[in-house]
Amino acid sequence: KPLTTPGVCPVFLANVTFEPGCRNNWHIHHASKGGGQLLICTAGEGWYQEEGKRAVSLTPGMVVTIPAEVKHWHGAKANSWFSHIAVEVPGENTRNEWCEPVSDEVYTALG
């Protein structure tokens, strides 16, 4: 659910809620300068993972800083709803690239 209007507010904010077991695909926030994303965890429990790194358990009050050009995914744990505020960091030549799904094998191995 968007909290700001693109073109009216220079920073895009959205309230995002995942049902248990739901996660987004791997994706990248591209920018030639600046850019990236912030996740402000507000409810439930979730996961955040950067490519090649261990997944991080997320709980309310945590903030995740995701630099531009970092492939990652985020979503709910298998047994919990999860909500966060997504903040698109302003930058130049920004665009999102959606990649492959997070496999069930990778996701279920997280516990």
Regions from the language model: what does each represent?
Residues 1-28, 32-35:
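A short glycine-rich, His/Asp/Glu-containing loop-to-beta-strand
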Residues 8, 73-111:
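Double-stranded beta-helix
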Residues 15-19, 30-48, 87-90:
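Short, conserved beta-strand element in jelly-roll/cupin
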Residues 22, 54, 70, 78-80:
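A generic "binding-loop/recognition-motif" signal
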Residues 27-29, 51-54:
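Glycine-rich beta-strand-centered segment in the early N-terminal region that forms part
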Residues 52-69:
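Short acidic-glycine-tyrosine-enriched beta hairpin
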